Amino acid sequence: MNTHIKTFEQLTTKELFNIYKLRVDTFVVEQQCPYHEIDDIDLESHHIYLQQGKDILAYCRLYKQNDAYHIGRVIAATKRKGYGTQIMKTAIKFASNILHTQSINIEAQTYAKKFYEKLGFVTNSKPFDEDGIQHIKMKYTVK
């Protein structure tokens, strides 16, 4: 299993295709959220993913917006294998050690709140609707 952290420009067309396919399969098809999955944030993000052979096991993107770092589009292709935890820990470590941020923000789907709390994120908003799915804002403070 290999971990990759790449900017948009560093991704090959095949890597980008596999990332977009996983995201569309998860967010558009599985979660029935027919909204724009590909956006301009991709151009400014670090794309972080775990890969085994040709398969992407987990993915997230890390980006800076309004002077704050954010993690989004978190996916584990197979649930309950630890891939989601591994990709989040990689993103947090990269953000704190390489990008030198003191905090990281996420907008988590409410059902995943406990997953993010185990990683050290704290809820800092009431639930809100985004594209028909309940979310909460959460923040991680680097220790």
Where are these regions (language model features)?
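Short beta-strand micro-motifs in enzyme catalytic cores
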Residues: 44-48, 69, 134-138
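Residue-level recognition of conserved beta-strand positions in structured domain cores
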Residues: 73-74, 140
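Conserved GNAT acetyl-CoA-binding A-motif
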Residues: 95-109
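A conserved beta-turn-beta hairpin within the catalytic core of GNAT-like acetyltransferases
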Residues: 64-72, 79, 100-102, 130-135
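Conserved beta-strand in the GNAT
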Residues: 49, 55-63, 68-73
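Conserved acetyl-CoA-binding loop-helix of GNAT-fold acetyltransferases
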Residues: 76, 81-93
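Conserved catalytic-core motifs of GNAT/GCN5-like acyltransferases
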Residues: 117, 122-137
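Short amphipathic alpha-helix that is part of the acyltransferase structural core
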Residues: 1-40, 47, 52-56
